[in-house]
Design a protein with these regions (language model features):
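Non-ligating segments of multi-cofactor redox enzymes
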Residues: 1-154
Length: 154
């Protein structure tokens, strides 16, 4: 993977709360969708879905057509210097060693977590958040309920 590519992006979203328009920030990368559009449109099968849910690009198979880039509703795929599609693979090699993905380990605010979908449902995490668009791909992303100012989770 190309080290010059940023796999995470922070977007500003506008929400209306208590009749006031507010800005919130969401950090996202590949959502490792249940029904990944990138995988569906790839003419050479350069994506596979692993048992753990990771949508894994197969760099050697990629022909650089860019169909997956256009198909991803979250803009999570880009072309590398070699012209082939690249995306977050959730640091699959780190997970195999029992380590956290780089984004989770390096998050300065400790807000990114890697959790099993069964745990996320029982932990009160939500699939929806104001401003976040859930598309037909069924993204595997969950949100902690938004905290009001001066509320903290310990």
């Amino acid at each position: 993977q190309d080290p010059d590519i940023n796999w995470r992006h922070v977007d500003v979203m506008l929400i209306h709360e208590d009749e006031i328009e507010k800005e919130i920030f969401i950090s996202h990368s590949c959502h490792h969708c249940e029904e990944p559009a990138c995988m569906d449109v790839c003419p050479v099968g350069a994506y596979i879905k692993l048992e753990n849910g990771i949508v894994q690009p197969l760099h050697d198979k990629c022909i650089g057509c860019g169909y997956c880039i256009v198909a991803c509703p979250y803009g999570s795929i880009t072309k590398g210097k070699d012209g082939k599609a690249q995306k977050c693979n959730l640091c699959a090699e780190k997970l195999e060693r029992g380590e956290e993905p780089a984004c989770v380990a390096g998050c300065p605010c400790d807000v990114l977590k890697l959790v099993d979908s069964d745990v996320s449902d029982s932990a009160g995490m939500e699939k929806e958040m104001p401003g976040f668009k859930r598309f037909f791909t069924k993204p595997n992303i969950r949100f902690y309920p938004r905290m009001k100012r001066n509320e903290f989770i310990h």
